[in-house]
């Protein structure tokens, strides 16, 4: 499965004004809901917060990848959010974030581990990340991932 198959155009938001972790998670959960794969948004949001309580999902270079497995997720999917202004996502993070990818995965199965590994491999390429930050539309963002 290609990573772009886990997105849809409606699950990508660019230039968000979200200013803190709560607003970011709210917006990303709404973007995830565009897939129609969350049977309970509140339960999924609770799963994200529980995962964040274990350890920060801030990666590096302004990138954060919140993710959770939950019974309310019917199939794996990705959502992306790019912020207008970088923010401190978690008090323990070393830097501010402006580029976030949320992975939703069903409770059973391990596809989310493959998704996370492939996404992380892509995000380690600074040129690729710079291209994502320069995109103007969700379609261009998705095309950049697919290139």
Where are the predicted features?
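Cytosolic covalent-transfer regions centered on His/Cys nucleophiles
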Residues: 1-147
């Amino acid at each position: 499965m290609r990573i772009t198959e886990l997105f849809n155009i409606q699950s990508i938001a660019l230039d968000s004004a979200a200013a803190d972790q709560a607003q970011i998670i709210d917006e990303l959960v709404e973007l995830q809901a565009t897939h129609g794969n969350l049977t309970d948004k509140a339960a999924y949001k609770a799963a994200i917060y529980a995962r964040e309580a274990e350890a920060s999902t801030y990666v590096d270079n302004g990138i954060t990848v919140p993710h959770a497995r939950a019974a309310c997720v019917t199939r794996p999917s990705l959502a992306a959010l790019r912020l207008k202004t970088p923010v401190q996502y978690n008090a323990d993070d070393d830097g501010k974030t402006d580029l976030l990818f949320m992975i939703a995965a069903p409770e059973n199965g391990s596809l989310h581990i493959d998704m996370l590994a492939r996404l992380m491999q892509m995000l380690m390429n600074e040129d690729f990340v710079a291209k994502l930050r320069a995109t103007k539309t969700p379609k261009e963002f998705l095309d950049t991932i697919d290139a």
